[in-house]
Each structure stands twice: as structure tokens, then as C-alpha cells.
Amino acid sequence: MKKFLYTALSLMIAFAGFISCSDDQTYAEQKDKERKAVDAFLKRDVTIVGPSGDTICNVGVINVITEQTFLDQDSTTNLENNEYVLFANNGIYMQIVRRGVGEKVAKGQTRQIACRFIEYNILGDSLQLRNDVSYWHTNPDIMAVTNTSGTFSGRFVTGDMAGSMYQTYGEEKVLEGWLAPLPYIRVGRQTTAEGEIAKVRLIVPHTAGQSNAASNVYPCFYEILYQECRD
């Protein structure tokens, strides 16, 4: 049943990508369309709903801050103002909902991190993928992340433990967008009622996204939980 669901979902995603590129647009035109879609998304007061009409995520109207403001605020985003920091070098927008418990991934470390997420296609205005509920996938997406002198890289676990990102897109390398929060969040496990794991929201352009987004030039919104895997 799961294999059928992922095959069907992969076909839907591929078809959506075909539709987005089927009018012979140039790459420059596609990028311009993506930029306009992101600009509109920031202002639209979006609420993401599921197939049954249930509310999954209230995105709201987004207030963009600079990296300098973000650093001046101790690398935090003000949730009351619904702030997202824009990283100028890669076009990723990030909101830190919770900084998490435990420790950051230190230089020289490789750690296993489990992720639960939703993926929303901004250009297609649709919920595209999720593993935050067991109906879609019982496994979280597990990535082995390495911090090499402050530069993060990662690979998704494959095989029987593969999560929905690898099963859907077939790409072992972790997308840049998912790695962007790691310098600023702690990765641990919840052991008390108050100590909740890290949670972020991201707007990821195609240049930092998964393979289908990169091929078809569309941005995605993510809400992701980061948790340290058990030994």
C-alpha cells in the first residue's frame, strides 16, 4: 500500500512539474515566476490545509528581516512579529519556532538527525509531501549530518529505513534548505515537558531544494522538526 501511495505521489509531483514548465518558458522567465510566487506568498496570509480540510499550518503574513538584524537578536526570529530571516547568499527564508534542546552539531561531528516535516509547493499552491502523520509514512526522514569546519552536508538514510523524501525523489543527498538551520538550532531529544525539540519554517528556492523543485524551478515551504536519533 505504501509503495502504491509513493508511486502515485511521485507521478503527481512529476505531472505538476511538467505543467509548470510546459509553456516553453525560458529559465530566466521561470526564475522570475518563482520570485514573484515567493513575494506573493510572503504577503498572502496563507493557511495550509490537508485533504480533509483540516488546518495543518498557519503561515500568516511574513515579516522579512536581514541577517544583521537576525544576528543582533541573538540569531532568533520574533514569533509575535512572524519574522523570517532572508539569507542573501542562497535565497532561503527561515523562521526558528523553537531552538530545541541538547547541543548543536559541533565542528568535526557527524550526527544522525530524524526529521518530521510538511512540504508545500508555493508555485502550485498545494501540499505536496508530508511525514508528520503516520498515514503518509511511519518512518521519519533520517539524515547523517556532518559539520566540516562550519559547512554542513548530509545524506538521507536509504533502504528499509528510508523516509518519504528519499522514497519520493530518490535523492540521497540532503537538500541545502534543510541544512540551513543547523548552525542556529540545538539537536537533542525531548526529556521534559518544557524541553521541546527544534522546529523551523523555511521557504526554499529551487536552487536549494529537492531534485524535482530544481528541475522544474519552483519554491517550497517547509515546517520541520529536528530530533537526535537514538543510539
Report residues per predicted region.
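Cross-family detector of peptidyl-prolyl cis-trans isomerase
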Residues: 5, 21-231
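C-terminal motif of bacterial Sec signal peptides marking the signal peptidase cleavage site
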Residues: 16-20
